Design a protein with these regions (language model features):
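Short charge-dense sequence patches
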Residues: 1-3, 29-39, 76
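Negatively charged, low-complexity tracts enriched in Asp/Glu with abundant Ser/Thr
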Residues: 1-28
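Compositionally biased, intrinsically disordered low-complexity regions
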Residues: 11, 45-46, 106
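Surface-exposed polar/charged interaction patches
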Residues: 11-12, 31, 90, 94
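Aromatic side chains
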Residues: 13, 38-39, 103
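Short aromatic-glycine-(Arg/Gly/Cys) micro-motifs in beta-strand/loop hairpins
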Residues: 33-68
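Short, compact, well-ordered microdomains
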Residues: 64-107
Length: 107
């Protein structure tokens, strides 16, 4: 059964190692164990903007309920860190600022 609690961006940023993000989304929603998949999320913390979490953390009900919107998917932590850098760079190049939340709302 697909859990609708997890919120996903319509067009998430994808790391180079991601081939079929919709399949990954389905597996994450089902609670499958995907040890190499990392997710970039908006942060719930007021002093942070983006966070990187391993997808397997969403197998726990509490984490599924409290997970902020997922805006990126990567294969491996290093790729996830590069993806965050790419997001910040894109926002800055297109706006001249780093208002990442506002930019992602309009994307």
């Amino acid at each position: 059964m697909v859990n609708r609690v997890i919120r996903w961006a319509r067009n998430p940023y994808l790391g180079e190692g991601i081939e079929d993000w919709k399949e990954i989304r389905t597996k994450v929603n089902k609670g499958d164990f995907l040890p190499t998949i990392f997710l970039v999320t908006l942060s719930n913390h007021p002093d942070h903007v983006l966070e990187i979490i391993p997808s397997f953390m969403l197998r726990q009900r509490w984490n599924r309920k409290t997970c902020p919107k997922i805006v990126g998917i990567a294969k491996g932590k290093k790729e996830a860190m590069n993806l965050v850098a790419d997001i910040v760079r894109e926002v800055y190049e297109n706006t001249g600022a780093v208002e990442i939340r506002e930019y992602l709302k309009k994307r």
